[in-house]
Amino acid sequence: MARNTLLIDADDTLWENNIFFEKTIEHFITQLEHLGYTREYIRHILNETERRNIRQHGYGVRSFRRSLEDTYLKLAGNAARREIVQEIERMAVELEATPPHILDGVPETLAYLAKHHRLILLTKGEPAEQAGKVERSGLQSYFDAIEIVLEKDAGTYARMIEQFKIVKTHGWMVGNSPRSDINPALHAGLSAVFIPHVATWELEKCELESGGGKLLILTSFRELRTHF
């Protein structure tokens, strides 16, 4: 078996992530129902606010909290109440303190893969926040390197290829996000393993595209043992 370099995503690939954000959003929307807007409209405004704030403030709980606050203040206007802002702050603190919930089959699959391939954890987000998740996950020992980046695009993967001297024919990206994990990796000339997650963040969804490498679609992380 050829030794490959596997770049592996973290959030919603190794551990649950977006389900906790979704629970927070549902609670947030409930808090705003008294304003008279539909739940769908509140979510639409929140999504638009997140897209805007990500460009300026990046990813992570702090940016998310800002988006919740901005959405509330926009919709409430002069009727904004301090106790709602305080509740948003409380929800953000609770969200950031949530420990990683490792997905089924991940530890034993990583242990197997680490014996045969070079594993690099590639995750995006606020550096300190993501580093804390990695440490609390207890999975760091399976990886030859851990890379935390602010964004995942084709340029990011090109840098990874150069930094780690990855031979493209033996380089793979493994993840759940078409927008951040799969499409840009393929465009950079790597192959990719798409493992869909039922709760993938709305802003990470897009159509799968073709690229320079091969695309493998699996239903679970443990299936990697069959192919690698």
Where do the PLM segments sit?
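A metal-dependent, Asp-based hydrolase signature
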Residues: 49-94
